[in-house]
């Protein structure tokens, strides 16, 4: 017997898809399979749990049972999918299997842990489940090392510092947020973190970790070392593509999908952090929301392509929040930066003086939507 639409995953992407399908069809069979509890929580909240004194269970917004009842679902929590037989259209776990008409892969991405000696001592904060496993250690830690100065690393560094902890942030780039914007734009946030007491080790490399009687010894390059109580990996995300690979799907940085969110197999789709849409991986909430709306229509028989507008990315650093949009990582832009006490507006323009990107901070963030309208589509 077919289970209709089968979705592997239970995070934000999967839930958005369920809600959009149910807006259009109240009865089509929907089956969700996931390795976690399937309870709903807001993942961006993980960047602020320490300063707000929240436990993992405090993040739960809706239990799996409530979710199933509200949306008429068949749920299989704590279930690892072991194989996909794409030819027979069957999903398999160790103790069960499910026939599907259409299959959606929405399992997200896992935190990348740098392959250094002692890497097993590093913690990750990419899910409620991961936070639950280490919340006591993080709450009790006085000295914290964060590996990675990107978006998540910068958010966590500020949060742990606001909680009164001694924070060191290490990155091999010369500035924080290096993959998102040039140093002259990120310097305002970098200066604020330093003012707060975050010890920035830029152009530096973690070489290994070792447990000691009094904590964890982190060995760095240039014969340096520091001792801390906890180490957090914030060096990016990697989709777990082994399952899709065994199903014969085309893989690059994620599972490759077209504008219809369809993989190289006509009956299998991918969504969220797991998907690479026409060559782009977009691990942000707005593109996932828009993708879920389009995919719901297509699973129900439409043929609607995904058209993504230029979108804002929000960096949730409360002492100095930032919004950015456009091609902020382009190397050939000329940046016009206006700074004042209330905030910053940085405009990135090309050789023709066309606005291609912007970054705004603090009180100047209210200008973001006006600037967004002037960016080319």
UniProtKB/Swiss-Prot annotation:
Belongs to the FAD-dependent oxidoreductase family. Gene3D superfamilies: 3.30.390.120, FAD/NAD(P)-binding domain (3.50.50.60). It holds the Pfam family Pyr_redox_2. One of at least two accessory proteins for anaerobic nitric oxide (NO) reductase. Reduces the rubredoxin moiety of NO reductase. It catalyses: 2 reduced [nitric oxide reductase rubredoxin domain] + NAD(+) + H(+) = 2 oxidized [nitric oxide reductase rubredoxin domain] + NADH. The keyword Flavoprotein applies. The lineage of its organism: Bacteria, Pseudomonadati, Pseudomonadota, Gammaproteobacteria, Enterobacterales. One of its GO terms (molecular function) is oxidoreductase activity, acting on iron-sulfur proteins as donors, NAD or NADP as acceptor. Pathway: Nitrogen metabolism; nitric oxide reduction. It is an enzyme of class 1 (oxidoreductase). This is Nitric oxide reductase FlRd-NAD(+) reductase. Its EC number is 1.18.1.-. The gene is norW. It is found in: Cytoplasm. InterPro entries: FAD-bd_OxRdtase, FAD/NAD-bd_sf, FAD/NAD-binding_dom, NO_rdtase_NorW, Rbx-bd. GO terms for cellular component: cytoplasm. Its main location: cytoplasm. Its cofactor is FAD. The keyword Cytoplasm applies. PANTHER family: NITRITE REDUCTASE [NAD(P)H] (PTHR43429:SF3), PYRIDINE NUCLEOTIDE-DISULFIDE OXIDOREDUCTASE DOMAIN-CONTAINING (PTHR43429). Keywords: Cytoplasm, FAD, Flavoprotein, NAD, Oxidoreductase. SUPFAM superfamilies: FAD/NAD(P)-binding domain. Coiled coil: none annotated.
